[in-house]
UniProtKB/Swiss-Prot annotation:
Gene3D superfamilies: 2.30.30.790. Signal peptide: none annotated. This is Large ribosomal subunit protein bL19. The lineage of its organism: Bacteria, Bacillati, Bacillota, Clostridia, Thermoanaerobacterales. HAMAP family: Ribosomal_bL19. It comes from the Bacteria. The gene is rplS. Belongs to the bacterial ribosomal protein bL19 family. The keyword Chaperone does not apply.
Length: 115
């Protein structure tokens, strides 16, 4: 049991930007295409965070050309370059699945957190 925790702790990322559900983020993710490697940004609203430790994931949703696109990222993945928080959102739910039913601009409307 301690061996698993030791291996897990050395693979955990230390420099993760703190963010919450409802925040609008831009995720920079390394994509490997053949022999090339490039960084692909994905911007949207965080609708879910789940898991803990090395298995923690988060899901980002955006509307692209009228179609909702969701992408789930492992938080401690070596391919995750950085996470940039664009706007802080104020929500009262841990999972924002209700955004899936919304159409148009309502799908991206979340109250902004005043700091």
């Amino acid at each position: 049991m301690d061996l698993i925790k030791a291996v897990e702790s050395e693979q955990l990322k230390k420099d993760i930007t703190p963010f919450n559900v409802g925040d609008t983020v831009r995720v920079y993710y390394k994509v490997i295409e053949g022999d090339r490697e490039r960084i692909q940004p994905f911007e949207g609203i965080v609708i879910k965070r789940s898991g803990s430790g090395l298995r923690e994931t988060f899901t980002v949703r955006r509307v692209s050309y009228g179609v909702g696109v969701e992408r789930t990222f492992p938080l401690h993945s070596p391919r995750l370059e950085k996470i940039e928080v664009i706007r802080r959102g104020k929500v009262r739910r841990a999972k924002l699945y209700y955004l899936r039913k919304r159409v148009g601009k309502a799908a991206t409307k979340i109250k902004e957190l005043m700091e």
